Each structure stands twice: as structure tokens, then as C-alpha cells.
């Protein structure tokens, strides 16, 4: 990607692409398919696996909307905040337990507007609040402390690391640890390994290890792309286009 200013080249951005089947075979690529990269928010659907595998959806009576929000980098619109609130209520908790922090919701930037000085925002407006509400629910279900659920050594995060490693076909100790913008652990891995994780996720019920969970996650995101994203965003348009 090239960016110009006044007709003169100012910036060049390079990237890599890897297309992988669910066996891990690289079928097509551009750039370096093994480039070591942090997964950031692409990891969210996989970070939900411990909750899904433990029967958390059924335990708390979550719907597809709640599952979709666990995978979201949402815009902090009313529907996103309300869905996060519902998840917390089902887990018997309030937004004060969320460890994601807060920021001005994305929908203001997308609309080209600034919030009123009178408006205040809490953790439910954070784009990662659904993921964190899922974290909280998992801890409640298993009797784990909520005080430091974002710490890498917490049983929740150990379960996340274990399941992510299984999905991408790596040893958990080989996942490179970092901290995401919402304070949760995040992992770097070769691009081809991340692509494998998404190939398996897309296979849904056909996956022999996580099929039931992948089917629920895929269906939820497909049915409720507006909860995964937000009004006016390109990724929402892509998802709605099928």
C-alpha cells in the first residue's frame, strides 16, 4: 500500500497473507507466510474456547448474541453495551469487575463526532467488553478469583493459552506472550499458524476436536455481525456481504 502527499510517495506499507487448509497445508501466500505476528483481536474467538468447551453458554443461558459479543471489537453502541450488561447480569456481576479499562467508544470516531462533555463511559463501552464479560463468566462458573483474571498465570488465562495452542498446532510454551491493549494476554505466532486456527474455526462442526464450539462461535458471528463490529465499519460490510 502506498500513500502519497502532493503527488509524492510518502509511505509504503508491506504485509503478508497466508491461505491454509484445516490440515495446516499452505495453499497460497503472499509475502512471508511464516511471519511472526501478534494475533491481537483476531484471537478473540479462540480466547472464548475455554468458556465454550466448559458448557458456559448453557450454564448461564447465553444466546448467540452474547457469544458474538465475546468475539467482538465492537463500537460501543447501545446494543453492544446492553449485551455486555446482560452477560454480566447472567453471571451475577457488575461492570466494575471488568479489567479491560474504558475509552471513548469507536462509534464517535466513525461518525466523525466528539462526545458531549457531559457523557461518561465505563468498561462496558470498551471494544473488548464482551471478551472480558466472557472471561468473568468463566471465572464465576469455575470459582476462580476475579481480582486478577487478566494475569497470565491465572487459571483462566492458562486455559486460554492451552486451547489456543491446541487449535494452532503449537506447543503452549512456544507462543510468544505479550499484553493486549485491554490488559489481557495476547500471543504472537507464525502467520500460517493463525491461519490454521481460522481454517479450523471456519470448518465449524467438521472439526474433530472443537467442532461443537466452533459451530456455535461461527454461527453467532454470522447471525450477529452488527454485534461483532459496528455501524458504518468496513468489516461489518464484509460480514454482511457473506
Predicted region positions:
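A short glycine/serine-rich beta->alpha loop
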Residues: 30-38, 70-74, 118-126, 178-185
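Beta-strand segments within the central parallel beta-sheet cores of soluble alpha/beta enzyme folds
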Residues: 61-71, 97-101, 176-181, 210-223
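Conserved SxxK-family serine transpeptidase/carboxypeptidase catalytic domain
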Residues: 210-242
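Active-site-proximal alpha-helical segments within enzyme catalytic domains
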Residues: 185-204, 213, 217-222
